[in-house]
Structure formats: C-alpha cells, structure tokens
Amino acid sequence: MIVFATAPIQTERPRLPQDLFGAIADLKRELNAVILAHYYQEPDIQDVADYIGDSLGLSQQAASTNAEVIVFAGVHFMAETAKILNPDKQVLLPDLEAGCSLAESCPPANFAEFKAAHRNHLVISYINCTAEIKAMSDIICTSSNAVKIVRQIPPEQPIIFAPDRNLGRYVMAQTGREMVLWQGSCIVHETFSEKKIIQLQLQHPEAEVIAHPECEAAVLNRARFIGSTTALLNYVQKSVSPAFIVATEPGIIHQMQRQNPDKLYIPAPPFNNCNCNECPFMRLNTLEKLYWAMRRRAPEVTVPETIRLQALRPIQRMLEMS
C-alpha cells in the first residue's frame, strides 16, 4: 500500500497595515463611517475617534449622525443604544464580548417580576442596561442627567430606579426623593478602596478626590466633586488644584492629561493589587479589532424591531428631558 503524505494547508494570518491610523482613516471615508468612543477606551482608540464622550454625549451623537456606519468603541449596551436610535444604519462593535457587569446584573425576566411587584411605579433606568430593560422602562437616564430627570417627576409619582443602586442612592441624596432601587452595581466602581484613598490623600495632601456616582457611598463621601465622566473632565479643567485622585475607570485620565497636561492624575486604587479598577469589558476593544471590524463590516449589533420600538420611547424621553 502506498501512502501519500499531504502537507497541511497553511492558513495565512491576515496582515495589519503598517499605518493602522491611516488605514482606519481610509476605511472611514470609504464606508462613510463615524467612530464613537467612550472615555474608558484605550488611548489609541480615543485618538482615532471622531467623538469621545460619556453615555449621554454618545447617545446624542448617535442620534444626530449622518454617517452610514457607526463604529462604536464601547460596550454592548452602548452599541445597542446607537442601533435603537439608528435602525437603518449599520452599527459595528469591535468585540461582541464587550459586555457590562452592571447591565448583566439586571436580567430581564427578574426585572419583569420586580416591576410587576411595584405596580404604578414609573421606571427610570440608567442607560447602562440591555435593550430588553430599556423596553420595560418609562425613561432612560445617564449619570449626567439622572438628577435633572428625577427632579422633573411629580412628587406623588413613585419611582423604580434601575439597575445601579449606587447611582440611585446618590440621586436620592441629591433630590431628597425616595425611590425603589434595583440592587445592581458596576464591578469597577465597587472595587475602589476607601482606606487606600485615605492613604493617598495623606501622601498627596494637595490632591482632590473626584468620583463617579457609581462608586459606593464611602468613596463618594471622601470626594470633593462627584459627577459623570464629562463632568469630571470639566471640573479638572476649571479647578485650581494641581492634583486629583480619580475614582472612576482610569481610561478617562488620557483625556484629562490631553486637556491639562501640567496636572497630576492618580487612579483610585482597588482593594487588592490587581488591575480591577480597569474595566475588563472596555479593554476587550483594541485598535486592531476596530480596524478589522471596519474592514469586514462585522461584528454587527442588531436589535429585534419589537424591542427596538419599545426601547426607543424612553430614550427619546431622556433626550427631550435633557
């Protein structure tokens, strides 16, 4: 018997262009695409983006863009929101595994039962939730406008606030309004150590603590200023302080350094020595994945039309009330 040996088929790995920034710019023109990036993305992605912002700003940009393709450098619920607002546009996400611990903390079936147990309650949901949760909501909010929106609700109207309990408590403290809170949270913003922040304050007495309202109350109590990522950026720009301890995902420090390079920015430390103050989901997106998403026009984010229409109404109410 004669056995013929066959060489294994060599699958050549696709090569990246030497000038990745230039190649992305070329694809952007070719596709009539816009790149939207969250402040928590890696610096290279922020540098190639057309717009960098927080959830509210990104939603507003997605609602107003004339581009045919939206490349969303963020996490899945953000790309979903862009698709809800733009059903006829293609929405690309560099990595479909870029989820969100806060969104995942609110399963739709469980939330439906929770909502049924609190009839006659108005549902205000933080934008960090799935399309299914948005579809069950009356109004969507972001950390930029949550206080403003709650203040517009008649005082006799009971409210469910979901999914972030820490943001909900902060809004309650700011408005004096009692709300029923869904007990969800962000793994990043719950990892900051109050004890280590105090130690940093002793080492850097000139530094102001600034924090995102998704942080726990103990961390917020130590903060000189509390606000959304955009509000934190604006505060740093206006403050005379030479240094800041930043209690949010450290990706935002890239923009802080660009706007105010002479100031010192210290990421708030987590309880242990890991990099748990970095969002593992945001970090799944890379410049290379962004390039391949544009080159292949995939992976694409889609939302079933029935869910999209139900989720669109509360998002539109948010944009109107903002």
Curated annotation (Swiss-Prot):
Its cofactor is [4Fe-4S] cluster. Pathway: Cofactor biosynthesis; NAD(+) biosynthesis; quinolinate from iminoaspartate: step 1/1. Disulfide bonds: none annotated. Gene3D superfamilies: NadA-like. HAMAP family: NadA_type2. The gene is nadA. NCBIfam families: nadA (TIGR00550), PRK09375.1-2 (NF006878). Its EC number is 2.5.1.72. Binds 1 [4Fe-4S] cluster per subunit. The lineage of its organism: Bacteria, Bacillati, Cyanobacteriota, Cyanophyceae, Gomontiellales. [4Fe-4S] cluster binds at C100, C186, C279. One of its GO terms (cellular component) is cytosol. This is Quinolinate synthase. One of its GO terms (molecular function) is quinolinate synthetase A activity.
